[in-house]
Structure formats: C-alpha cells, structure tokens
Amino acid sequence: MTLLMDYMRGTRANKKGESSQTLLSPLKVDNFGKQVRVGFYHHPDTGMLKGKYSSGPMKEIFGIHHMKAHVFDNNLLVTGANLSEDYFTDRQDRCMVIQDCEPLADYFDDLIQVMTDCSFNVDNNGDLRMLPTYPEPYKEPKKFRNQMQHHIKYFRYNHKTEIPAGDDL
C-alpha cells in the first residue's frame, strides 16, 4: 500500500500535536514495514519562502500537492477534495469512479509510485527521509527539479500509448 500526500499539510500538526505523519508512521514502524510506503511530496518552491509566509497554512498557498487519485485493484477513484463523509454525501458531483480499467489504474499507480520516489518517505523509525538518489527539495531545488524531471520523462516514455485507428476510448 502506498499513501502519498502533501508535505506541508501532512506534517502540520493540529492542536493536539497530531499530523498525518504522526498518525500514519505507526503503519510503517509498528505494523506493516515494507508492505507500506508513506510519502510526503515537498514542492521545491516552498523552501524559498521567508518571513510570515514560511510556516503554517500560508505556506501551502505557494506550493501544495493536489493529486487526488485512489487506486484499488483495477479501479480508480478521482476526487476533488478530502475523503470525508460530508464530501461523499453532499458533494458527489466531484468524484469519479472508473472500474475494471487496468491500464488506467496501472498508470495512476505508477504515477503515485514515481511521485513517492520524489518525496520524503517515512522510514522504519518514523522519520522522513528522501531516497538516496534524491536531494532535499528545499536545500537543492534546482538539482531536485532536474532529477524529478528525468524521473517524470521516464514515466511518460513508459506509458506512451498509440491508439489504433478506429478504436474508441
């Protein structure tokens, strides 16, 4: 299982001191180890912010990860907001379920894996670490962008598909 979320939102603690990182780290540390990946994507531009915009919710305005795709087997759920009860009862027009579409589910699963590779990952101690091949995005943003661009190009090349004439989408 892979969980990918935004670094700024996922590490920001609530009034109780809880964050997505503190709530999800036990999945990796105590329970499932190598069966679980928990990644926090950190946009490289947020490291350049200074002063009153350098922490808290204000920082999220300048660079937040908004991919909201959920892959289950060969099914894909694309949403526009949180996975909350209110969202699925009052705002059903903002989600789409695509069932039994293995190529699309594989595409999104691979995209999530690539983005998780480019993210801070919860290690076996519950700490956030980049993979050894990646620089930290806020310390070396240019190097990070170049590495990520290469990774995304490779992903796009692997998923390049030609649709035969006469086939419907």
State each model region's role.
Residues 1-68, 72-169:
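Charged, low-complexity intrinsically disordered terminal segments
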